[in-house]
Regions:
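Alpha/beta-hydrolase fold catalytic core
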Residues: 1-45, 68, 287-289
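Conserved HGGG/HGGXW glycine-rich cap/lid loop of the alpha/beta-hydrolase fold
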Residues: 25-83
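Short beta-to-alpha linker loops that shape the active-site pocket of alpha/beta-hydrolase fold enzymes
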Residues: 75-79, 143, 266-267
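Active-site loop/oxyanion-hole signature of alpha/beta-hydrolase fold enzymes
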Residues: 60-63, 72-115, 119, 280
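Conserved serine/cysteine hydrolase catalytic core
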Residues: 199-253, 262
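Flexible "cap/lid" loop of the alpha/beta hydrolase fold
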Residues: 125-165
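Conserved alpha/beta-hydrolase catalytic His-Asp/Glu region
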Residues: 168-208
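Catalytic histidine-centered segment of alpha/beta-hydrolase-like enzymes
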Residues: 263-276
Length: 289
């Protein structure tokens, strides 16, 4: 998530109704409860958010998608209205998304497209290996890092873990947005003053474990995803960091039924900054999936 992305996330989440309960709670394979927030009418689809966020990050695109879909936005485990079970493994997140898709499929008796942003896209792809309830996947810059491409900063992951273990979640979140997102002092001050800050602090402990899990995935994650048989649309921001493009291309090379769409001018948060272009890509893809 870059600085523009996080700024947009703050604004979107602050304007969202963060006090309402989930429409349903789904039990995952390990017993963890996953909160699902549902709006709209029409064919079902599931939204899966990325790191340092919750379901409110889809405040901009969610209502627009809900004009023609029944939108089921989840809180991933460890935050918001979802539970958590240790030890953490990214595979449990795959199971969470699969469980939600199966619950929605049971209610609507149809296949369910899953749309995931960043780490949420990785979770959506992994879930597609577990269930035929997922009919298609839209992944926004969530492909595993290919061999030879450095993912993040291992020292930073250790530093964030130490802050978590020291019981300093606010400092953890600030370190993440400063060093990974690139937010400056003024941006951090505004973020801390925003109503969404406590929600993000409460979920800050999930950041280092996700950085570590993604960093360890690498080539093994890419090779496993070669078995995904559902149609997969990967969406890439035209102005995103080069490593996102490299990961997207590496995954597309392995997929049997993959497509790439590039949104000109977008970076890592087109769901905030270029919602119309993103929704157009989703609609076009799902019409042919």
């Amino acid at each position: 998530m870059d600085a523009d992305a996080l700024s947009a996330d703050v604004s979107a989440a602050a304007s969202a109704d963060v006090g309402g309960p989930p429409a349903r709670v789904v039990t995952s394979a390990d017993g963890t409860l996953i909160g699902v927030f549902t709006t709209g009418q029409g064919p079902p689809l599931v939204l899966v958010h990325g790191a340092a966020a919750d379901h409110t990050t889809f405040r901009v695109v969610g209502p627009r998608l809900a004009q023609r879909y029944t939108v089921h936005a989840i809180d991933r485990r460890g935050r918001g209205d979802s539970g958590d079970t240790l030890p953490y493994a990214i595979e449990r997140e795959f199971e969470d998304v699969a469980a939600v898709a199966e619950a929605v499929r049971d209610a609507d008796t149809s296949g369910v497209p899953v749309i995931g942003h960043s780490y949420g896209g990785r979770c959506a792809l992994g879930a597609a290996l577990l269930t035929d309830a997922i009919s298609a996947v839209v992944c926004y810059e969530g492909a595993p890092t290919p061999p030879g491409v450095e993912y993040g900063d291992a020292a930073l992951a250790d530093e964030l873990t130490a802050l978590d273990e020291a019981g300093r979640p606010a400092d953890l979140l600030e370190a993440f947005v400063r060093r990974v997102v690139g937010m400056d002092d003024a941006g951090i001050a505004a973020y801390r003053a925003d109503p969404v800050w406590p929600r993000r602090v409460a979920a800050a402990h999930t950041i280092p474990r996700e950085l570590l899990a993604e960093g360890r995935s690498g080539a093994a994650g890419l090779d496993a995803l070669a078995r995904v048989g559902q149609p997969v649309l990967q969406v890439l921001g035209g102005d995103s960091k080069p490593e996102f493009g490299e990961a997207t291309a590496a995954l597309d090379d392995r997929l049997a039924n993959g497509t790439i769409v590039v949104i000109p001018g977008a970076r890592h948060a087109a769901h905030h900054t270029h919602p119309d272009a993103l929704i157009e890509a989703i609609d076009t893809f799902l019409a042919g999936a």
